[in-house]
Amino acid sequence: MGFVNTLTQASDQENQRLRASPQVFKLFVLILFVLLVLKIRRHRANRITNQYGRQICELHGDARVAKFAFSKQLSDQGKALAGDEPFIIRNGRARELVVTKPEHIYDFYKGDTKPCSLLGHAVGALAGERWSMIRRYFDPAFSFQSARQAIPELSASIDRWLDDLPLQGTGTGKGFALEIKKPCRFLPLRLAAEFVYGEIFDDKLFSALLDLNVLHEVILHDVIANKRLATRLGCWFDRAAAKRMEEFRSRWMEFNLGIIQSARGASKACPAERIYHGVEKGDLKLEEFLHTLDEILFANVDVSSAVLGTLFEHLAVNTAFQQKLRAEIETHIQTRTHTPDTDSDIDINTETGKYLSKQDTLMNFAVMEAMRLSPAFDCDFAAFSLPECTAVPKEIGGYRVPARCPVVIDAKRLNADRATWGKDGDTYRPERFRDIPPSKSRYGFMRFGVGAASGRCLGKHLADTLFKLTLIAVIERYSLHSVHDGPEVELREVVVRV
């Protein structure tokens, strides 16, 4: 009987399994159907069409690496595909809308936007309450007034950089020649670090900062090449990259906390130490403090140095404009030198600050034109901005764009757009700014951002100051000349009339 019962039970279980099989199959089919419906709905929701139902153009292939490493080619491909209209590129699984015209930028910024950047907890990647709290502690150190007060220290550092310049070049008989971009490579980093860390910063700390910058660049390329590194799970698939990220976090924290401790022990002025009070009070998170310093010092190293390189290379070619600029700077030096000597240092600082603040000078035009051709937005590369997301559905360039769509700006095309800059938008002509009112270039000029977004750049006053002080110092000491058949610039000493 036991054997019979066993057979009966086995038979019953088999019958139950057979009866359950269709139910399992039906459930499986239902799940597939639901997933398919959701995918179709998501696809339809993400479709970007114009009022006639025509779908927006999309470049084939993954542009995640290309938009940084081959940005010019990608920009040209987009123009060939879509003309002056917005178009779509792929960034891994994400689709990003590329905008190129001032009217596109206006449409985009009409409502709120949300950052979608690689900057973590830095101020450039946040919004709302956390953004306001970070700015509360960082803004005083990076205000217009703070940048102007730092003129003597910044000027002294630039003079030391200039003293070393002939040693990096090759003698020409009349002067010396060098690839001007090379000595400009880390000047902005040095000046920004001295500004942030104050009196405690020295050559030894700068050497440590350069080592950190090398590691930072490797990590940036890791993240660009592998988007999964932005997630905890993704880090498990590339342990070497994850270890580099952890090493940088540890060394970056040690570097900054060590400076703060040294500044306090020596009773030396250090803006970073004052900002750190926000961490100690619990208003700032330590990672917000560290990530924002990371953004200030590392995120714009290549772009800031490119602005200086572009500035001097074009001045070397455009000698007529250079001569007019030198005459203007000589006039400023005469004014600065002949001020009443009640307190000469303060007077020189005040006069230089006034000159730097003027918007109608050839010096300002020269810097603006260099920035137009090498836009200094929050990215290490010069053509495409980091993405920001639409907060609500919008119509951009005639296309209906859904909420949460990442949008990037092709600054190369925007900064040469004929509607703003005329037919010679691709050429260097600084005096064009005399005829272009700020209202016309508000959405057509990518410097520290466009429109209201330009006000969010924490370091814009510092950048403007160091660009102009470097220009004054170079033109005061040297005339620049292009060298045929090469990338070098020849520098010849000049005597400035005072």
From Swiss-Prot:
A GO molecular function held by the record: iron ion binding
Subcellular localization: Membrane
GO terms for cellular component: membrane
Annotated membrane topology: Single-pass membrane protein
GO BP terms, alphabetized: secondary metabolite biosynthetic process
Pfam families: p450
Superkingdom of origin: Eukaryota
Residues that, per the record, bind heme: 457
Membrane spanning stretches: 20-40
Swiss-Prot/TrEMBL keywords: Iron, Membrane, Metal-binding, Monooxygenase, Oxidoreductase, Transmembrane, Transmembrane helix
The UniProt record lists the keyword Repeat: no
Pathway the protein acts in: Secondary metabolite biosynthesis
UniProt-listed Enzyme Commission number(s): 1.-.-.-
InterPro entries in the cross-refs: Cyt_P450, Cyt_P450_sf, Cytochrome_P450_monoxygenase
Enzymatic class: oxidoreductase
CC cofactor: heme
Keyword Iron: yes
SUPFAM superfamilies: Cytochrome P450
Induction, as annotated: Expression is positively regulated by the aspyridones cluster specific transcription regulator apdR.
Role this protein plays: Cytochrome P450 monooxygenase; part of the gene cluster that mediates the biosynthesis of aspyridones. The polyketide-amino acid backbone preaspyridone A is first assembled by the PKS-NRPS hybrid apdA. The assembly of preaspyridone A is initiated by loading of malonyl-CoA onto apdA, followed by decarboxylation to yield the acetyl starter unit. The growing polyketide chain then elongates into a tetraketide. The adpA PKS module catalyzes three Claisen condensations, as well as beta-keto processing and methylation.
Family membership: Belongs to the cytochrome P450 family.
Name of the protein this chain belongs to: Cytochrome P450 monooxygenase apdB
UniProt organism field: Emericella nidulans (strain FGSC A4 / ATCC 38163 / CBS 112.46 / NRRL 194 / M139)
